Every structure is written in C-alpha cells, then in structure tokens.
C-alpha cells in the first residue's frame, strides 16, 4: 500500500507539472521508444517489430510491456532495471534460448510473465528466484526436457503455471512441492507415461489439472492424494487401459474427461465418491463393460457423454441422477431404452442415442422439457401413438437411417413446437402430418416407398423439404408460387402487418427440384415436341408394319440374306415405335397432372418393360445396320469376282444361315445391354425410361459404354463402305442395280449417324462441366432425346418403301397382282436378288437365275398365269426409275414372245449342251444382264405387243409370235 501511495503521488506531480507547462504554452510528451506504441496508462506495445534486443527509452512508469513476436535470442543482465513498476511482461514468440540469471532483477512488481513459443530447453530457475509477486508463468511450447528442483523457489504467489507442449517425460514433483497456492497446472502435450502416487500431494489449492495428450499408461491409486479442491481433471488422449480409480479421492471434482483412451471397462460405482460431478466425457474408448450403477446418484451431473463403447449392450442406470440435462450414448450395441427413463430424468433437454441397435422406443411422455432427440442409425421399425405424446417442448427430432415402415397417424399430434424433423433413409410408405403446424424443415430423402405426395396445406410454416422424388416437390413449388389470399392475410396479421411479414423469409426450398426430365404437368412438354413425337410414332408404326407385311408375305419369294436383314431391321424399328407410342399414350392419359403418376410410372414394371424395349431395339438396329453393311460388301465383292460367285443352292443356304446366326448373336448382345440397363437402374429415374437423363447418376458409366459401343458400330459401317467405294470403279458402278443397293445402304448409314450424334452428345454432357447450360440445359436435352432417338426408326422404313424396287414387287404381290409359279418365282428372285435394307436389286449369289427350262415347260400350260407374271414385271418396270432394270428373265421372255402366255406348247428351250435350240448359239453364263437386254433398250413396240397379246389371249384371238434368243437360266 505504501508503494502504491508513492506511485500515485509521483503520477500526480507529473500530471501537475504537465498542466503547468501547458498553461505556459509548452508541452511535455510522454517518454516512449520510437520502436513501440505507448498509451497514457503506461502500456507499451513493441510486438512484431523485428527487434533483436529489448528497446530502450521507455518510461519508468511502464506497467505493461509486450515485445513478443520479435527476433530476440537472449536477455542480458539488468535489461529491465529501468522498469521497476512493470507488472506484465510478454516475451512470447521470440527465439529466446538464454536468459541471464540477473535479466529479470528489479522486477519486484511483475505478476505475469509469458515465455511461451521460444527455444528454452530448461526452466530459467535462477532468473525466476526474485520474482516474489509473480502469479502467472507461461513456459509452454518450448523444448524443456527437465525442471530443476529450485525452479520455482520464492514464487509463493504463483497461481497459474503452464508447462504444456514441451518434452517432459515425468511430472516435476520436487519443483512443485512448495506451490501450495497454485490453482491451475497444465502438463499437457508432453511425453509423460506414468503418474506416481502423491505426485501432487502439496497442491492443496489446485483447481484445474490438465494432463491430456500425453502417453500416460498407468496412474497410481493415490496419485491425486492431496488434491482436495480439484474441480477439473483432463486425461483425454492418453493410453490409459484401466479406469483411473484414483479419481475417487477427488471429492470436489465437477468436470472429468478421459475420452480417447484405451479403457475397456467402467466398474460398478465408479463415481460413487464424486457426487459433485457435472460433466463426464468418456467417448472414444473401446468399452466392453459399463457398470449398471456407475452413474447412479450423481445429483449434480448435467452432461454425460459416452461415445464409441462398441461392446456396451446394456443401458446404464441413471437413478438419482435427477439433474441430467444432456445425455449422449452413441456407437454402442444398446438394443432398448428403459421404460422409466423419463421418470428419473425429468429435466432432460438433449438426448443423443444415435448409432446404436435400438429396436423399440418407450414413451418419452415424462420428458416434458426435452427439446432435441437424435435417434438416427438404429434399428427402429415403427413409431407408436404414445411414443412422443405430450412433448410440447420438442423442437428437433432425428429418426433418419432406421428401418421405420410405419408411423401412427397421431404420433406427432402433440408436437406443436417441432421445427425440424428428419425421417430420411427409412422405408416409409406414408408420413402423417397431423400436429406439425410449426414444422420448418422436413427431410424425407431415401424413402423410396413413399410414392404418394404430401399436402402442402397441412404444413403452413414449412420452408425446407427434401423428398425422394422430384415430382413430390411440384405441390410445394406450386403452393409457394400461388399462395391463397386468405392464408396470406392470416400470415400478415400474425406477423403484425406487411412490414413485419416482409422481413420473414417466405421462400420454399424443395429438393430435388422438378425439371425437364421430372415434369409436373406434361411428359412431352411443348406442343411442337408433342406433335413431332406423334408424327414419328405414327410413321414408324405404319411403315415398319408395311415392310414386315410385304417381306414376310406368303406370296413373295424366299428371303435372301439382304431381305432377311431388312426384315429384322424393320422389327427392331417397330419396337422403337412401340416405345414412342407408349410415351405418347402416357402423356395423353396423364394430361396436365403427370406429377401424380410420375413416381408410379418410373418405379413400376411398365417403365422397365418400355425401357427394355427401347434399349434393345435401338442397340439391335445399330448392330444390324453394321451387319448389313458387311453383307453388302461381301455380296458385291462376290459379284465383282473378288471372292467367287456362289453357285450351288447348298452354299446359298449356308450363307443365309451364317447371317441369320450373326443377327441372332447381335440380338443376344442387345438383350444383354437392355438387361444391364435394368440391373444398373440407369433407365430408372427418368420418365423416358432411357439411360439418357439429366445430371450424373450411378448408371452414367453404363450409358457411356452404350454410346461407345454404338459409335464403334457406326465407325465399322463407315469404314466398310468407304473401302467398298474406293475399290469399286466407275465402270462397275454403272450397273444401276448394283449402284442402287450400295447407295441405299450408304444413305442409311449416313442418316443414322446424323441422328445418333445429338443423342450421344447429350449423353456425354454430364461428364463435361457446364455443358448442359451451354447447349440449352435439360429442356434441350429432353427435346433432342425425344426427337432424334426414335427418328431413325421412322426414316429407315420410309427409305425402303419409297426407293426400293424390291418393296414395290413385294407390295404388288401383297395386293394380289402376282401369283406363285415358276415365272413368278423367277421374277421375284431376279427382282429382289441382293436387296439389303431397301436397296435396289443386285444379284448377291446368283439365285435369281436358278429356274431351268423344266420350270418354263410346266408354266407354258398356264398362259394366263404367265401373262400376269409378265404384267407384274411390267408394272415394276414402269414404276422404277430410269436407272433401274427389271427382271432379265421376263425381259427375254418379252423379247421372245412379246408375252410368256403366247409360248403355248413350245418344246424344251434349252438343250443339254447349253445351246439355244433356235440359233445354236452358246447360252449366257454370266450372272449379270447385259445392257442390251435391259428394259431401257427394249422398244416401246415390244412392250405394246405384250399388252396386245395379253388382250388377245383373254379373248381367244390369234396370237403373233416373235423369236429371240432366250438366255439360259443357271443355278
């Protein structure tokens, strides 16, 4: 007190002197070093200035000096001799490695000394001896390995001592034996492995003891002897294997932590002598046993946290722990909760029982103050009516990641204060909303059985909701955009007028949001897209059925490999048309309210069947087109003499069989791809039932694989046809039949590739950041998918019907314009030989010229049938382009007789030697008709003669015969 009075007197004199000087027009500035910032109260801040020594020129009345975060490496003797009134000295964050024994001499008023974050290797005991007023000493974050016995001699006023974050290997027992006034001791973050008995025997005033983050494996039973006033004990993050029974010698202990150790069991009555405990942290220990009575009768316990006791099976008894407010028991194998839990814990506010094996819930009716319940990741299967009855204070309820299948419709009836409800990742088929008038946030993600929508009007205060399906957001988005005016007035009145209501956020957040692939009203979107899809559907169904009917008609000739592939391609395209028809029908049935049926459609068998058909048909069509390209290449090479023409009927059949097997194998590949789309669920999650949808999904890899396979198929077709065109010369392509077939397949490949590119681009879009936004977003992706995906199935049969002479011949037979018979078969074979995918007739294997003279002889008796077959050939001639040619057989029949019906009983036309009987010339052996034998070179008189002959024959008039060479019909 005397020193304080002297100091106040000196300060008063200084102030009076300064005032007198000011009265005379002069000023006396306060003494301060130019390297520091000083204040009027005697504080000097010299931190972070890069100083290498203690600054000079400071006022003698400085009581606070901060020279931390500099580069001072040592303190010389008497460096602070001019600062007798210094009370707080901060030297942290320097590189101090040496402190002279006399460096701190003269600092008799020093109370706080901070030496942390330096390079000290031992406690500077000599320099600390004369600091009799020191109350707080920080030596943490150094490299201290030892503490001399006389380190703290003379520091009788010391209250707080920090020795943490050093390299101590043992508790400094001797240096601490005289610190009876010490209240807080920190020895954390060292290398201490053992605490012996009576280690803190003389620290009777100690209140806080931190020993965390050491390597303590063993604690003596009497190590805490003498700590009669200890309230906080921290033993976290050590290697303890046995429960520290020494804590029973701490009668005033209030906060205990020994989490993150290796303690395996907590004995019965473990805390029976620690009745004042308020908080216990026991988590992250491999507990296999917890005594039932371990936590009984802890009347002051407010928080109990036990986490990670993976072997714990029984719920601990909490009898007598009447003031518990927070209970955390997670990561155990507890299967049930005591029915009388709320009878003992009436003031409980927070319960966390997550990550256990709880199957049944008792009634929480007695826990009237409970505000937060966390029961996620358990085995709960149902919520009964009385489980949460009477819990009017409950605000947060987490029941996620359970197996809940049923919730009673009145289970939430009394939860008038509930604002957050998490029911995600369960198996709920319905969610009751009665009583949830105050709910702000609702999570229902992962309840895939929840297909029905929620009524937004039953949740008036809901602001955030997550649902399993985007369609269920349609009700909330629409509700938010069109609020009922009456309800709007009620809200405005409740919040006290428009100004107050404007401050309240009224935005509804619903996830996942509906969009182009999750429409709320119409599946097909705009009318332009809808009309286009309808047109594609009708054309695909009509023309593919027409191609199949004409190709497989019993009136037509036998199928060549090319026509067989045409039929299979039409079948695949027809299935695609069926897929589009299903979408158009669904759009019509769910007109304006697709959200009500979207979930049922996506998750039902109908979408799976339609998706299977779509993937199978599209993949098979792509692969068949590649096979058709290969077949055309082989056929043309054979005709050009590259591989030799097939002569025998057996070889022709073998060739047809090989292509049929190849088509079947490709069909099996397509079936496998369609099945994989169902297995991976890539066709799910979109009402289009296709593996092409917006955003990334688990099936994105499968989608990419499909696109790559289709790309390879188109690339193969393009390479095959490019090589074919390069090898064929202008003279060889001059044959109109050959050129027509090759050109037609080329057009098919070109158009199908063009239609495939947009679909493939949008399939890869999710892999490229920002692509969907750049090209128009999901709306554009959906439009492209709806139009370009089935467009090839629409155009392929149209090309075949409009540009294939083979189809015209089949169509005439389908209409009954032709009859079966030798010349009929001859005309059919010659017209359709080598037809592929709507190509012009090109002889692929020579089967078109397989009729012999015997066949003619049999047909000569039926002059009317021969005339009708010739008439069919003439119709083909007149309906074909000028560049195409008709059957060479009927061509020569017309030359010979003007009409085959006029031949009468002409004898066998061919001799055994292969010469024509009328001329004796060698019969033709080539499989190609010469240009002189085409209908283009025939005179119109011959054509008219055939017509006149047919007219005369029908009326029994005389006939006129002409004699021309008839070519030999080869096998």
From Swiss-Prot:
GO terms for biological process, alphabetical: bone mineralization; bone remodeling; G protein-coupled receptor signaling pathway; hypothalamus gonadotrophin-releasing hormone neuron development; negative regulation of cytokine production; negative regulation of toll-like receptor signaling pathway; osteoblast differentiation; positive regulation of canonical Wnt signaling pathway
Extracellular-facing ranges: 22-531, 585-608, 680-699, 766-782
Membrane topology: Multi-pass membrane protein
Annotated Gene3D superfamilies: Rhodopsin 7-helix transmembrane proteins, Ribonuclease Inhibitor
Membrane side Cytoplasmic: residue ranges: 553-563, 630-658, 721-744, 804-971
Annotated SUPFAM superfamilies: Family A G protein-coupled receptor-like, L domain-like
Signal sequence annotation: 1-21
Annotated glycan sites: 71, 202, 297
Entry's transmembrane regions: 532-552, 564-584, 609-629, 659-679, 700-720, 745-765, 783-803
Stretches assigned to the LRRNT domain: 27-60
Disulfide bonds: 32-38, 36-46, 342-367, 473-510, 607-689
PROSITE patterns for this protein: G_PROTEIN_RECEP_F1_2 (PS50262), LRR (PS51450)
LRR repeats: 58-82, 84-106, 107-130, 131-154, 156-178, 179-202, 204-226, 227-250, 251-273, 275-297, 299-321, 322-344, 345-366, 367-390, 391-414, 416-438
Pfam families: 7tm_1 (PF00001), LRR_8 (PF13855)
Function: Receptor for R-spondins that potentiates the canonical Wnt signaling pathway and is involved in the formation of various organs. Upon binding to R-spondins (RSPO1, RSPO2, RSPO3 or RSPO4), associates with phosphorylated LRP6 and frizzled receptors that are activated by extracellular Wnt receptors, triggering the canonical Wnt signaling pathway to increase expression of target genes. In contrast to classical G-protein coupled receptors, does not activate heterotrimeric G-proteins to transduce the signal.
Protein name as it appears in the record: Leucine-rich repeat-containing G-protein coupled receptor 4
Upper classification of the organism: Eukaryota, Metazoa, Chordata, Craniata, Vertebrata
């Amino acid at each position: 007190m005397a020193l304080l009075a002297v100091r106040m007197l000196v300060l008063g004199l200084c102030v009076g002197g300064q005032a007198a000087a000011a009265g005379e027009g002069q000023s006396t500035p306060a003494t301060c070093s130019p390297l520091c910032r000083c204040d009027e109260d005697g504080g000097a801040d010299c931190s972070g200035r890069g100083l290498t020594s203690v600054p000079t020129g400071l006022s003698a009345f400085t009581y606070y000096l901060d020279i931390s975060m500099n580069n001072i490496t040592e303190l010389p003797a008497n460096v602070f001799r001019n600062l007798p009134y210094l009370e707080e000295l901060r030297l942290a964050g320097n590189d101090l490695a040496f402190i002279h024994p006399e460096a701190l001499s003269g600092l008799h008023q020093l109370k706080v000394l901070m030496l942390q974050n330096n390079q000290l290797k031992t406690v500077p005991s000599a320099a600390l001896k004369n600091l009799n007023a020191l109350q707080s000493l920080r030596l943490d974050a150094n490299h201290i390995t030892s503490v001399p016995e006389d380190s703290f001699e003379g520091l009788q006023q010391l209250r707080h001592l920090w020795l943490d974050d050093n390299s101590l290997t043992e508790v400094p027992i001797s240096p601490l034996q005289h610190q009876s006034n010490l209240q807080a001791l920190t020895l954390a973050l060292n290398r201490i492995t053992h605490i012996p008995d009576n280690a803190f025997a003389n620290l009777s005033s100690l209140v806080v003891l931190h020993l965390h983050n050491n390597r303590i494996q063993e604690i003596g039973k009497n190590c805490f002897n003498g700590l009669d006033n200890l309230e906080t004990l921290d033993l976290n993050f050590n290697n303890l294997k046995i429960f520290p029974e020494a804590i029973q010698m701490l009668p005033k202990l209030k906060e205990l932590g020994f989490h993150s150790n290796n303690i395996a069991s907590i004995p019965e009555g473990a805390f029976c002598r620690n009745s004042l405990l308020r908080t216990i942290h026991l988590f992250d220990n491999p507990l296999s046993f917890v005594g039932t009575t371990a936590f009984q009768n802890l009347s002051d316990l407010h928080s109990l946290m036990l986490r990670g006791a993976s072997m714990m099976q029984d719920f601990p008894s909490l009898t007598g722990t009447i003031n518990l407010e927070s209970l955390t028991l997670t990561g155990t194998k507890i299967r049930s909760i005591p029915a009388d839990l709320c009878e003992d814990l009436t003031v409980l506010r927070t319960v966390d029982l997550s990550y256990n094996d709880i199957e049944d819930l008792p009634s929480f009716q007695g826990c009237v103050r409970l505000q937060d319940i966390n029961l996620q990741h358990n085995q709960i299967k149902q919520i009964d009516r009385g489980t949460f009855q009477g819990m009017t204070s409950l605000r947060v309820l987490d029941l996620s990641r359970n197996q809940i299948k049923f919730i009673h419709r009145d289970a939430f009836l009394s939860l008038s204060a509930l604002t957050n409800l998490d029911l995600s990742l369960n198996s709920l088929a319905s969610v009751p909303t009665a009583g949830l008038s105050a709910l702000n946030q609702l999570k229902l993600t992962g309840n895939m059985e929840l297909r029905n929508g929620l009524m937004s009007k039953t949740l008036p205060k809901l602001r955030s909701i997550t649902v399993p399906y985007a369609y269920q957001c349609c009700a909330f988005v629409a509700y938010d955009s069109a609020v009922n005016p009456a309800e709007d007035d009620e809200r405005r009145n409740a919040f006290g007028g428009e100004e107050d209501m404007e401050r309240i956020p009224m935005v509804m957040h619903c996830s996942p949001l509906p969009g182009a692939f999750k429409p709320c009203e119409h599946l097909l979107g705009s009318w332009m897209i809808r009309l286009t899809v309808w047109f594609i559907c009708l054309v695909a169904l009509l023309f593919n059925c027409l191609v199949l009917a004409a190709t497989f008609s019993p009136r037509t000739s036998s199928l060549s490999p090319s026509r067989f592939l045409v039929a299979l391609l039409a079948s695949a395209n027809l299935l695609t048309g069926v897929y589009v028809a299903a979408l158009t029908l669904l759009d019509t049935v769910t007109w304006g309210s697709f959200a009500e049926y979207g979930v049922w459609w996506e998750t039902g068998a109908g979408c799976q069947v339609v998706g299977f058909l779509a993937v199978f048909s599209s993949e098979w069509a792509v692969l068949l087109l590649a096979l058709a390209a290969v077949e055309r290449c082989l056929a043309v090479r054979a005709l050009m003499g590259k591989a030799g023409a097939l002569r025998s009927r057996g070889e022709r059949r073998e060739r047809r069989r090989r292509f049929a097997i190849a088509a079947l194998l490709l069909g099996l590949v397509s079936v496998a791809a369609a099945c994989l789309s169902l297995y991976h669920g890539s066709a799910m999650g979109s009402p289009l039932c296709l593996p092409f949808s917006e955003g990334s999904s688990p099936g994105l890899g499968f989608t990419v694989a499909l696109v790559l396979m289709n790309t390879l198929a188109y690339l193969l077709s393009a390479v095959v046809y490019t090589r074919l065109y390069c090898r064929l010369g202008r003279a060889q392509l001059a044959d109109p039949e050959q050129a027509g077939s090759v050109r037609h397949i080329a057009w098919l490949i070109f158009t199908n590739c063009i239609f495939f590119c947009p679909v493939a681009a949008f399939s890869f879009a999710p892999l490229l950041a920002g692509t969907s936004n750049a090209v128009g977003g999901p709306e554009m992706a959906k439009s492209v998918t709806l139009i370009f995906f089935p467009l090839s199935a629409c155009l392929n049969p149209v090309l075949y019907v409009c540009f294939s002479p083979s189809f015209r011949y089949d169509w005439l037979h389908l209409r009954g314009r032709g009859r079966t018979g030798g010349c009929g078969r001859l005309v059919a074979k010659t017209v359709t030989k080598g037809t592929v995918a709507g190509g012009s007739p090109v002889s692929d294997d020579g089967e078109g010229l397989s009729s012999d003279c015997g066949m003619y002889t049999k047909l000569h008796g039926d002059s009317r049938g021969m005339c009708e077959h010739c008439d069919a050939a003439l119709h083909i001639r007149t309906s074909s382009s000028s560049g195409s040619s008709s059957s060479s057989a009927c061509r020569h029949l017309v030359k010979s007789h003007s009409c085959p019906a006029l031949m009468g009983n002409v004898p066998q036309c061919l001799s055994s030697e292969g010469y024509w009987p009328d001329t004796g010339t060698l019969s033709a052996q080539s499989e190609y008709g010469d240009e002189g034998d085409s209908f283009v070179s025939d005179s119109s008189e011959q054509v008219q003669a055939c017509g006149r002959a047919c007219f005369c024959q029908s009326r029994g008039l005389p006939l006129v015969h002409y004699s021309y060479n008839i070519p030999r019909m080869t096998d």
